[in-house]
């Protein structure tokens, strides 16, 4: 990951009714969207009015059932395993994962103040 370590990579929102929230943000900030097939339903990639891919809005179902209804920013880390060890030793909690995504893994943690963040990188 090198020079990208510590940078924000992606933002996801996981909610019970993704279509309703997708339409809300489309009206409020002008986002457009593309469907992403997941099992027997669709989640959504969110784009700016100019077409730049910026976020995801996901259903709180299946593997995402335990995720909080919050915007979660994902940060690139060198080693998800080492970051998880540091998280727990400093009073944080592992909320979900680690989960595999292509060659990398991601995990959602909660810091000691209660805020959520995602970590993305090599195992």
Name every feature range the model reports, one short phrase each.
Residues 18, 49-52, 73-113:
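Vicinal oxygen chelate
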Residues 102, 122-123:
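A short acidic/small-residue loop/turn micro-motif
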Residues 8-12, 70-74, 117:
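Short, structured motif recognition centered on aromatic/hydrophobic residues
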Residues 4-6, 65-70, 101:
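Short glycine-enriched loop/turn motifs at secondary-structure junctions
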Residues 1-2, 97:
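Short helix-capping and inter-helix turn/linker motifs at the boundaries of alpha-helical repeat units
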Residues 2-52, 89, 105:
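Core segments of cupin and vicinal oxygen chelate
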Residues 31-68, 112, 116-122:
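Conserved short beta-strand elements that form part of the metal-binding/catalytic scaffold
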